[in-house]
Amino acid sequence: MKNYALVLAAGKGTRMKSDIPKVAFPILRKPMIEYIVENIEKSSVEEIYLVLGYKREVVEGIVKDRAKYVYQEEQLGTGHAAMMAAPVLSKLDGNTFIMPGDVPLIWYKSIDRMFAVHEDNGNDFTIVTAHYEDPEGYGRIVRNEQGVIQRIVEEKDANDFEKEIKEVNTGIYIVNNKKFFSLLKNLNNNNAKGEYYITDMVELMKKDYKIGSYMIKNNSLAMGVNDLYAISKAEKYLREYINKDHMLNGVSMINPETITIGHNVIIEPGVTINPNTTITGDTVIKAGAIVGPNTEIHNSRIDSHVVVRHSLVYDSIVREGTTVGPFAHLRDHADIGTHNRIGNFVEVKKSSTGHNTKASHLAYIGDSVVGESVNFGCGSVTVNYDGKLKHKTEIGDNVFIGCNTNLIAPIKIGDNVFIAAGSTVTKDIPDNGFAIARSRQVTKEDYSKYLISPKPKKEE
């Protein structure tokens, strides 16, 4: 028998107080629905169906062709959402895993365990439950003396005895397709909200079909994310889980509670990460690197024995033995060579540098190809923008660029060139050249009195 998944993801998420669909909200910079789809893909599920409604094109843009879609134009409850998929799933032999789209921490191994319990016990309808010492806000699982589930009662409808029940409904189910979906049409909406609820299927199925349960051991995996506070709780859980995994694999973290590592980040053993550091995207950090404190790295590669402190690195490569920062900014496919020094308040954009090149402070390198052993003096700028277009700067090997130098692109600087401080260079410089492009200094002795008013003397 095949396994299917049905994710109920049509809601707006009004408690998020945003126009973004709830399931598209980022958790550690990745949309909520991504976590769900990725884990379902890793499980034994063969086909995923998403029920979409509010701003469905946003969710489709995230998931693309990894799922099939059905649409719920009006959001009339979980049962109504499942009805939208019934014409398809009722015809398919097998079982379906049904879950809300706002439970991003569900794990693929848990999904497979749910299927196993469902099949091993011959269940037609398996309700995934959890045990909470404080179950406030959750629907309670009501069982008879034999332990068989009789109904699920929402807290607002529960009596005093039922409110004391600590086993709750997670909103996650495994169902036999033909039996469950054929009965959905019998659901009614005789309730205060006029909505259809999957929980009412217990009443429809308990007489003729087998209802069972699976109690999830880690309640966090079934945590619903309905507001921004819940997003912070989900991020905290994921942060602790991810950081622990890296530390057990040999990554040193100082104050790990202040460090955020994305799901796709690869960090080799022997890396040290200092406080207040965020590493996301498809980033790779190699052994011996030291990152942070106060550093952001996204979609980048940090090679062995690189040090990045108090800096931003986006979509870039930093090669072996280089130091970056403090307060440097690498972006837009910067490729920093081996044993470079990119110092404080230096920005490198869409540029590459060769071995042993240094820009120690207050420099901008943009749209440039820079050779080996180049020294950028303080205040050096590659002037790449003419007001309409960006232009390229090419700098050879063994070039000395004096302080406060402007290189007006497009321009080529040859090998073994020396550029005097304070120059504005507008023409190419050949190999072994010396360039000075500034006005000659004129000094007039005893002349400042004509320009500066004398300060009055203080009275003794």
From Swiss-Prot:
Chain intervals for the UniProt region annotation (Pyrophosphorylase): 1-228
Protein location? Cytoplasm
Q: Would you say which domain of life the source belongs to?
A: Bacteria
State how the cofactor is bound.
Answer: Binds 1 Mg(2+) ion per subunit.
Listed A to Z, the keywords are:
Acyltransferase, Cell shape, Cell wall biogenesis/degradation, Cytoplasm, Magnesium, Metal-binding, Multifunctional enzyme, Nucleotidyltransferase, Peptidoglycan synthesis, Repeat, Transferase
Q: Which residues bind Mg(2+)?
A: D102, N226
Pathway the protein acts in:
Nucleotide-sugar biosynthesis; UDP-N-acetyl-alpha-D-glucosamine biosynthesis; N-acetyl-alpha-D-glucosamine 1-phosphate from alpha-D-glucosamine 6-phosphate (route II): step 2/2; Nucleotide-sugar biosynthesis; UDP-N-acetyl-alpha-D-glucosamine biosynthesis; UDP-N-acetyl-alpha-D-glucosamine from N-acetyl-alpha-D-glucosamine 1-phosphate: step 1/1; Bacterial outer membrane biogenesis; LPS lipid A biosynthesis
Amino-acid positions noted as binding acetyl-CoA in the UniProt annotation, renumbered to this chain: N384, Y385, A421, R438
Corresponding gene? glmU
Q: What does this protein do?
A: Catalyzes the last two sequential reactions in the de novo biosynthetic pathway for UDP-N-acetylglucosamine (UDP-GlcNAc). The C-terminal domain catalyzes the transfer of acetyl group from acetyl coenzyme A to glucosamine-1-phosphate (GlcN-1-P) to produce N-acetylglucosamine-1-phosphate (GlcNAc-1-P), which is converted into UDP-GlcNAc by the transfer of uridine 5-monophosphate (from uridine 5-triphosphate), a reaction catalyzed by the N-terminal domain.
Assembly, in brief, is:
Homotrimer.
Task: List the PANTHER family.
Answer: BIFUNCTIONAL PROTEIN GLMU, NUCLEOTIDYL TRANSFERASE
Q: Which GO terms describe its cellular component?
A: cytoplasm; membrane
Q: Where does UDP-N-acetyl-alpha-D-glucosamine bind?
A: 8-11, 22, 72, 77-78, 139, 154, 169, 226, 331, 349, 364, 375
Catalytic center residues:
H361 (proton acceptor)
Enumerate the residue ranges of region (N-acetyltransferase). Answer: 250-460
- Put simply, this protein is called Bifunctional protein GlmU
Q: State a single Pfam family of this protein.
A: NTP_transferase
Q: Acyltransferase among the record's keywords?
A: yes
